[in-house]
Regions:
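Bacterial N-terminal signal peptides that target proteins for export
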Residues: 3-12
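Hydrophobic alpha-helical targeting segments used for export or membrane insertion
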Residues: 14-20
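C-terminal motif of bacterial Sec signal peptides marking the signal peptidase cleavage site
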Residues: 22-25
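Bacterial signal peptide processing site
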Residues: 27-29
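Penicillin-recognizing serine hydrolase domain
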Residues: 31-38, 45-71, 76-78, 132-227
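Acidic helix-start/capping segments at beta-turn-to-alpha-helix junctions
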Residues: 74-79, 111-134
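Active-site SXXK
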Residues: 87-107, 115
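Short glycine/serine- and small hydrophobic-enriched flexible loop segments
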Residues: 100-107, 129, 172-179
């Protein structure tokens, strides 16, 4: 549909504005820490400048596509959120903390590959079931995992795609994710999303991202969510 196509384009249109400011709360990536540093360095972006540029990008994109647009970025202690707060269903982005919780409970990594790389719903449900079997309540276990790292979500107890997880809370967790020992495998596979699942920020080679989209029946609008590290 037209709304779905616009969702793809909308995500891509924010890439240039965001790429320079995406940072992690942790130290360097183990895969790149041995790469020689450049001889010159640039000062860290000023938060006010970042907010101004994000405000401009969000406003421009929202007007162009007649859509609600929101962005949040975080470096752990510092978080900036502009535009829509992202109060609707989070869709498949919630598979990221579900996969982490499931791995902590002994889930098979092959299920994580399918659930994250291909966004396979059956694999994600198997991970969810693993957490429920070990913890008794999968929704509470995922909520507690997020809260341990300063993030909050209301996890739907049956249809987890309908969970709500604000953009600001997603950004906070995304900044912490590389620091979580149990999340190491999830962090790796986020870099290997299959081509037909790559949209918007997930097309950037130096990033890791998980997207989710669907029809928000409450508003009768298609929504696109993307957590990007």
């Amino acid at each position: 549909s037209r709304d779905t196509v616009n969702s793809y384009r909308l995500g891509a249109s924010l890439l240039a504005a965001l790429t320079l400011f995406m940072v992690s709360a942790c130290s360097s990536d183990p895969e790149t820490e041995n790469v020689p540093a450049p001889s010159t360095s640039s000062p860290a972006p000023n938060p006010d400048s970042v907010r101004t540029q994000l405000d401009h990008a969000v406003d421009k994109t929202a007007k162009k596509y007649h859509a609600k647009v929101g962005v949040a970025i975080s470096a752990g202690d510092d978080t900036i959120a502009v535009g829509d707060k992202g109060k609707g269903p989070v869709w498949s982005t919630i598979k990221v903390p579900i996969a982490i919780a499931a791995l902590k409970d002994g889930a098979d990594k092959s299920l994580v590959d399918l659930a994250i790389k291909e966004s396979d719903n059956d694999a994600a449900y198997a991970l969810w079931s693993q957490v429920k079997w070990r913890e008794g309540s999968a929704d509470k276990a995922v909520e507690e995992l997020l809260e341990d790292y300063g993030s909050h979500a209301d996890i739907h107890d049956t249809a987890f795609g309908y969970s709500t997880w604000s953009l600001k809370d997603q950004a906070v967790f995304g900044a912490e994710l590389p620091c979580i020992e149990e999340a190491d495998y999830v962090h790796k596979v986020l870099k290997d999303i299959v081509s037909w699942q790559k949209i918007g920020l997930s097309k950037e080679k130096r990033t890791r991202a998980k997207s989710g989209w669907g029809l928000d029946e409450d508003d009768n609008e298609y929504t696109l969510s993307l957590i990007h590290i």
